[in-house]
C-alpha cells in the first residue's frame, strides 16, 4: 500500500505542476533578478534534459551583471545536469589505475583532499590584465539610430573594396564605379533590397543626396538586417576565434559608453576594413575597434572618454579560463567528457612512455660513452653519405665536341683567338680525340659553305683550322700512329693548361720489386716507366673502355688532375666524393665537358670513405648488373686517393686523427677487401684490379701531422700481404711514393717555402699537373701489365724520401721569411708591374660614382653598306602592306622582364642595369627626389633609396647590396606562400569529412549564420536565439552532424617559376581599383602590354590613330587556362564562404585580359581574337595576328599569352605526372633551379611557372612610316593538329605537315629569287606601260570631248593609278614574299625562307618547346629532325637549339611568347644562349644530327632566321619562321628610304627611353586611359569614317 500511495501522490504532484506551468506565465526574467541580484546566488545547477535555463542565465549575466561581477571579482558558476553531470557527481576524481608491482616497500599515500568542481565559463566581458581594474567610467554619449547614409556608404565601400572613409559622398555610384557597369548594376540591386522603393536613376545621384531621399522611407528593421549582412563577414573571416559581434558591442558599450545606434555605425565602418588575414588575438580586435571608434568620434565631432584604469590585483578567473583546483594532469584531461576506458588507456600510454624513457636514458648513456671515447669528429666522420638516387652520369661528349668546334670557329672569326695559342692547340687536340663521323661532316660543311663569313684573313684562318682538324680527325679514327696539327705532333691536350713546362725536367724515379723477401731496385722497370711517361707526355693516356674507381678528386688535388688524364684517355671513371653537392657536380660536369673524349664516361656519386657501409655499397653498385641498377663494371683500376689533413703531436691525437686514420688506411683496406669478394664471386678468368696505393715519403719527418705518417706506412704493408694472403688473383698492387705536390689541400700551407726547399735540399717539388702526369704513366701498358705479375713500389717523390732533418730546414726557412717580411715595407715585395698610386697632396679625391644607363635595348640597326646592300636583290620584291614585322616585345616572368631575363639567359648574371631594374621590380629600391631626413643629412637628393630604410643607394652599389636577395627570390625556386595567398606546398590543405560521435560545445553565431547551420544540419544542430533580434544565437552541433575538417598533406611539387617576390602592378602605375578587381594574370598582361608598346617606341597608344583607323588595331592576346585566380575565388572561396567580389565571373573568361587591355590602354575597335591553345597559345596568337595583317584586316596587332599558377592547377598537373616531382629531385641532390632540364638524360617533367608575354605586330609599311623598331620579320606562322588518339596531352607529329611538299620541290624555278625578280620586273614594266597608255587615251578623250570635265578626268586618272597599284600588289602576291602560298608543292617552311632569298640551310637555330618531359623532348626533336631532313638540309649543318624553359619553367599560355622574345634577342645580338642545366644530353637525341644542344652561350658572327615550335595539350602544334630585319631593309626601294626610316627611329627611341626612365622614377610606366580618343559626339563619325585620323591629341573635322 505504501508504494501504491507514493505512486498515486507522484502522479498527482506531476499533474498539478504541469497544470500550474501551463496555466501561469513563466516569470524567468524576474526569477533571475531575484536569484542573481537579491539572493546574490553564484552557483546554480539546472536539473533537466537540456541546458535551457542555464543558457538563458548566461546571457542575462553577460548583459546585466558582468560589470558588477568583474568589479567585485565574483565569478558565477552555472552548471546543468545535461552538460556537467560528471563534475556535479565528482566522477572525474575517481580514476583507478593498477598499482605498479615492485619489490620495494611503498610508503602510504596521503588521502587527497576533496576537489572543488570546475567552474563553467560564462560569456562575460573580458577582464582587465593583472594589475589593472576599472576606476573611472567613461562619459555617456547620446545615442542615434542607424543611419541610411552609413548603410549605403558601407555597402558601396565593401563592394568596391575600399574603406568607409575613402568613399566620396558627393559622387554618385556610377562615378565611384568608374564605368564598371557590372559593379554599378549590382550595387543598385543590393540597395534596392534595402531601400524600397529606390528612386529612379539612383546610380546617378550623389551618395549624400540619395541618403536624404531614402532615409525617411526605410524601416529600421531593414536597415538592421542590412547591417547584419554587412558585418557578418568580417567577424566570420577576419576576427579571432571566439570574438563575436556581441563581444564587439559589449566592448563599445563598456569602454566607450556608446549606445546600440552608434555601435551600429562603428561596426559598419569596421566591416569595410581590408584586413590581409584573420586577426590572431582579442587584443588586436579591440584595438581595431578602438581605432575606428576614435575615428568615428572625430568624424561626428564627439568627445569620447575611454574607461580609465588603476592598478589592482589580478582576478582569479576570467571568462576564458577553466580552473579545476587540485586535479592531476590526467584528471584535468579526462574531465573533458572522457570515459573511464579512455582514461585507463591514457594511463597505460603513460606507462609505455615511462618504459621508453628508461630505454632512451640507457641508450643515451651508451651514446655519451661512445662520444667521449671516439669524439664528435669521428662519429660524424663515419656517417654514411651513399645515396643511389644522387648518382650523376656524364657521357654526352659527342655533343660537347661540336660545342667546342663551334665556339672555336666563332672565336676565330671574331678575332678573339690566335692559332699559336697553346689553349687553341689544346682545344683542337680535344676536338680530334672526340671526333666522329658526324663531327667530320660538320667540319666539311663549314669548310665548303658560306657559313664562314667576315674578315677575309680571319675566314682564311678558320678554314685552315678546319682543314687540319679534318685530316687529324680522320687519322685519329683510322688509328694512325702519327697525327699532325700545323706541323706539330698531336700532344696531350692537358699540356696547355699545365703550370710550368712539362717534360723539361729530368725524370728521377726508383722502382722496387720484391726478391727473396726483400725489396730491391728493378732497372728494367725503371726504363719501362720512363718509356710510359714519355708516351703520356707526347700523346696522353689511351684507356678507352677501361674502368676506373677514383676517390679523392677534390679541387686542387692530385686526383682532380689525374681525372683529366683519365677522361682524355677515354676511360670510364667513377668518382666517389665526400663533398657531393650541386656545386661539386657542376665542377665535375664542366671537367667532363672539357676533357671527356670519345667513349669516356664520368660517374659521380656521394661517398664517405670513413663509412664502412659506404665502402660496401659503392663496390656493390660498381659490380651489380645494369638491370639491377648497377654499373655492371669489372674494375680495371682503383685509385684510392682520398686524404685528410691532420695536425698534432702524439699527446694531441684526437677524434679527427682517428677519423683520418680510418679514411686513409682502415677503410682503404675494407674497400679493397670488398672488391676482392665481388671479383671472387664473379666470372672467372678476369684480370686483377690494379690498385694505385698512394704512399708518402713522410715517415714522420715533418712531424705534427697526427697519424698521417702511420696511415701511409700502414698501406705499405699491403704489398707484403699480397704474398701472404689469398687475393693475388683479384688485386694487383702498385705502391707509389708521392712527393711534395704544391697547391694541394695537404701541402698548400707549405707552398711559400717550396722554392727555397728545392735550393737547399735538392728535393724537387711538383705541380699537380706534373705529379698527375707521372701517376698516369703507371697505368700504361706494358708497365701496368708488370704490376699484374707482382707488387711494385714506385718512388716519384723527387728525392724527398732520402732527405733527412727536413723539419728543421723548413723551420729555418719560415723563420727567415718572417724576418724579411717584418723588415721590408710591403710595397717593396710587389713585382715591378704593380704600381701603388698615391694621392697628390692637396688634390681632392673624386666622389663621383658611375651611373647606370637604364634603357630599353632596342635592336641595333645593321650597317647599310656592309649588311643590307649585298641583299639588294630583294628591293621592290615585297608588298610591305602584307609583310608582318615584330616591333615590340615584353614579358612579365620569373626573371622580371624581357631585358633582365635575357641577361640571365645569355650571360648567367645581371648587369648593373639589370640589378637596378630587378631591385625596382621587387620593391627593394624606389626613386627619390627631395630633401633627405635629418638623420641622413637633410640634403637635397635625387636617386635611388632603400625602400625600407629610405637611405640613399648609389647606382654602383645596387648590385653588391641586392643581387643575392634578387637571385634568391627570382626564377625557379621553392614556392613562396606570400605570392599565392599563403599556399604552401609543404602543407597543402584538403578537407576531410567527419561525422560527430558526440555533441560539440556550444558557440555563438550571428542569426543569419545560425539559420544557415539549421538549414544544413537540421535536427543535428541546436540553435537558440539571443534575447534581442540582432544578438548572436547560441549554436551547438549534435551527434551525427557532418563537418569538414581541414587537413594538410605534403605536396611533392614545391618548386615553381614564380614572378619575383615583391612584384606589384601598382609600381608600374596600374590603379588600385584595377589591382583589387582584376585577376592577377590579367595584371601580368596589362603590364607586359604597356612595356611592349614602350619597346615599340610608342609612349601613348593613342598615337596609333594618327596613322590608322581605330578599326585597324587588332588584339589577339590569349590564355591557356584563363582566370585561374578568379576560378579559385568563384569555386573554392565561395564554397568556403569567404568574401569574393560579385563580378568575379567576368575575370574567369580567357578573353577578359584582352578586353581590359583594350579598355585601359588601346580603345581600339579593331578585330579581337582570343586563342586558347594551352601551352601553344602564344604561337597560335602569333598566327592569328599574322593572318590579320596579311589579310589587310589590321595594321597593328597585339599578340601573346598569359597564365597564372595556382595550387589547384599545380595539383592536377601532378596527378597527370606532367610536372617534376621535387621531393624526388631533392633526394637526387638537385637544386630547385636545376629541376627543369630539357633534353637531358635525367629530365623528368616540367616546372610550372607564371607570367605573360606580348609582342606588337605591324605591317612593314606602318613600321617604316612610324619609325618603329623592327625586331624580326614574321615570314610565316601556322598550327597543326595530330592524329586519332585517346590522350589529350600526348605529343604528336602533326607539325610535320609544315614541311609537306613533293619530291623535287626544291628544283621549282620560283624558289630562285633571281627568276622571280626578273618576272616581277617584267610584269611591273607592263603595268606601267598599260598605265601610261590608259592615261594617254584619257587625255585624248578629254581633248576630243567637251562633255568630260577636268574634275572627272582627275577622278579617272586617280582610279587608273589605284588600279595599277593593285595590279602591282597582285604581282607581288604571286611572285613576292607570299609566292609559295598558291603552290602546294612548296612547303610553308621552304616558302617562308625562300621569300627572302634563304634556303633551309640558312635556318640557323630553332627555339624548342623543350618542356623537360621525356616524351615531349624526344618527339619534338624528332619532328624538327624529320622536317630538316625532308627539306634537304645539308648534312653537317646542325641548327643550334635553344631550350629556354630550363631557366623560366613552363608558363603555359605565355611560354611561346617568352620563347619568341628570347629568340628575337638572339637573332639581333647573334648570341645563342646555352642550356646551363644540360649536364648530360640524352643519348636518344644523338641521332638527330641536324640539331645541336649548347650548354655554353655561343657568340656567332651573325644569324639569319630561326624556327620556333610550341606544343599544347589538346592536339595543338604551332610553328613559326622568323627572319632577321636586315632582309626587310634590303626590300626597301633605296638607301634613302632606309636612312629616312633611321632618322624617324632615332627620334622615337630617344623619346621612349626618356619616358621609360621617367616612368621608373615616378612609377608611371602604365598610364590607364580615362577616356576614348574621341568625344562622345565624335564617336559615330569616327567609327564610320575609315579615313578618320587623330591630329595631335584630338580628332578634328571628322
Swiss-Prot record:
Active site feature: 1175, 1409, 1450
Keyword Metal-binding: yes
Positions with biased composition (Polar residues): 820-829
Superkingdom of the source species: Eukaryota
Entries under Pfam families matching the protein: Fas_alpha_ACP, FAS_I_H, ketoacyl-synt, Ketoacyl-synt_C
Cellular compartments per GO CC: fatty acid synthase complex
GO MF terms held by the record: 3-oxoacyl-[acyl-carrier-protein] reductase (NADPH) activity; 3-oxoacyl-[acyl-carrier-protein] synthase activity; fatty acid synthase activity; fatty-acyl-CoA synthase activity; holo-[acyl-carrier-protein] synthase activity; metal ion binding
Record domain Ketosynthase family 3 (KS3): where: 992-1524
Known function: Fatty acid synthase subunit alpha; part of the gene cluster that mediates the biosynthesis of gramillins A and B, bicyclic lipopeptides that induce cell death in maize leaves but not in wheat leaves. The nonribosomal peptide synthetase GRA1 incorporates respectively a glutamic adic (Glu), a leucine (Leu), a serine (Ser), a hydroxyglutamine (HOGln), a 2-amino decanoic acid, and 2 cysteins (CysB and CysA). The biosynthesis of 2-amino decanoic acid incorporated in gramillins could be initiated by a fatty acid synthase composed of the alpha and beta subunits FGSG_00036 and FGSG_11656.
Assembly notes: Fatty acid synthase is composed of alpha and beta subunits.
Name of the protein this chain belongs to: Fatty acid synthase subunit alpha
Organism phylogeny: Eukaryota, Fungi, Dikarya, Ascomycota, Pezizomycotina
